[in-house]
Design a protein with these regions (language model features):
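RNase H-like, metal-dependent ribonuclease domains
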Residues: 18, 40-58, 63, 73-394
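Basic, alpha-helical interaction scaffolds
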Residues: 2-70
Length: 394
């Protein structure tokens, strides 16, 4: 067999020293032809517009730059700088800018983050995906790499740094009961078209009381979730007639949607454990009730599965359970009390309930962190200040 210092495997060029120089040259050669195509499609008074060229860049060039970046991201900065030049050429064509134009300004104008940050984003997201996928073949390899690697940086070490900053991430959904055994729920959205924030307190009170009068003898449980600007999250439920109030501070940075689901989950567990036969869950979260009704949640399938199981258990104990939607901040006493409790939980010094991140929420946290890093770079950059005065936010 012929000895080679470079080999191509699954579209990635590996060299004997893993410098990735051969792969970046390969990427540059592929992208240069596509940049020439973009040039032929652009012009000052004719040709494709900015949005069309940006779409072409994302499809034909950025996709090539992204492929395999979790592997070649360990290359030296000098090697990866070749790829930055490719992005710069493409953005100049898209904006019709001259060579002297600030690259940072072009990136902001086109909404394309620096490649360094994009690679970091894709790397962290792939690390999260590995961690949350059961029996992923790469997981054990990465664990071994962290222990034996002598390099200052590696894919395993960099992703682990990020994973250490966030709570545990939920794995795949495993149903406890067959879906055909789940109790079907039809929430009541009657108030959706009857009252809103512009309705007078008197109208709101009369409309809500008229609806609740249909369910005389039911225990009404109000639930709510809250999140502040710092990412602190709380959830609560209350039963005014029984004088019961429960509030919890949840894991930071999870969504309000998740907080609302946790509040309902805790209320359902209270109903189950205290064997309440007739109960109404009152919430202002339309999205959570729609998820319960449809049986599908894009961001929280695990938690929704838990809710369905608890609802089924309550039904099997001959419990009569009703879900009612009410508008937020319309003077409904129980709803306002739950909202106050949820906001009060934000001041708790310790987290009462650790909530594992779902994949989409963890991805959103990556995007938030990378977006903040890009904003800092743009704010502190000494170039492109003319655009910065008009567009200080990236």
């Amino acid at each position: 067999m012929e000895w080679k210092t470079e080999v191509k495997f699954l579209g990635v060029m590996f060299d004997s020293r893993l410098t990735w120089a051969a792969h970046t040259d390969y990427i540059k050669e592929r992208c240069q032809k596509r940049i020439n195509l973009m040039r032929s499609l652009s012009g000052t008074s004719w040709g494709a517009n900015k949005q069309t060229l940006l779409t072409i860049y994302k499809a034909l060039i950025r996709s090539v730059l992204d492929y395999g970046c979790t592997a070649y991201n360990t290359a030296s900065e000098n090697v990866k700088a070749k790829l930055d030049k490719i992005q710069a050429q493409a953005l100049r064509i898209i904006c019709g800018a001259m060579k002297c134009t600030s690259i940072a300004a072009l990136q902001v104008e086109c909404g394309e983050m620096p490649l360094k940050l994009r690679r970091e984003s894709l790397q962290n997201k792939y690390g999260i995906k590995i961690k949350t996928t059961a029996d992923h073949p790469t997981a054990n390899i990465l664990k071994q790499n962290i222990k034996i690697s002598k390099k200052k940086t590696s894919f395993a070490k960099e992703t682990q740094k990020f994973l250490n900053k966030i709570p545990p991430t939920a794995g795949p959904v495993v149903g406890k009961t067959p879906p055909w055994h789940h109790k079907t729920i039809q929430p009541i959205f009657e108030l959706h078209n009857q009252i809103n924030k512009n309705s007078s307190p008197t109208v709101v009170r009369q409309t809500v009381l008229a609806l609740f009068a249909k369910y005389n003898g039911f225990v009404k449980i109000y639930t709510d979730g809250s999140k502040n600007a710092e990412g602190v999250v709380g959830a609560a439920f209350c039963i005014a007639t029984l004088g019961i109030q429960r509030s919890f501070r949840l894991s930071d940075s999870i969504s309000v949607y998740t907080a609302e689901m946790i509040a309902i989950q805790q209320a359902l567990l209270f109903i189950l454990h205290h064997k309440i036969k007739q109960a109404i869950i009152v919430t202002d979260s339309l999205s959570v009730l729609q998820s319960i009704q449809s049986g599908f949640s894009h961001t929280r399938p695990n938690l929704l599965e838990e809710l369905k199981c608890i609802i089924t258990e309550i039904s099997e104990q001959d419990g009569n359970l009703i879900f009612i939607w009410v508008p937020a901040h319309c003077g409904i006493i129980g709803n306002e009390a739950a909202d106050k409790l949820a906001k009060g939980a934000l001041s708790n010094k310790q987290i009462d309930k650790i909530v594992p991140f779902e994949l989409k929420e963890a991805y959103a946290l990556v995007d938030e962190g990378i977006g903040a890093a890009w904003q800092r770079e743009w704010t502190n950059n000494k170039k492109g200040r003319a655009l910065f005065r008009m567009k200080s936010r990236k």
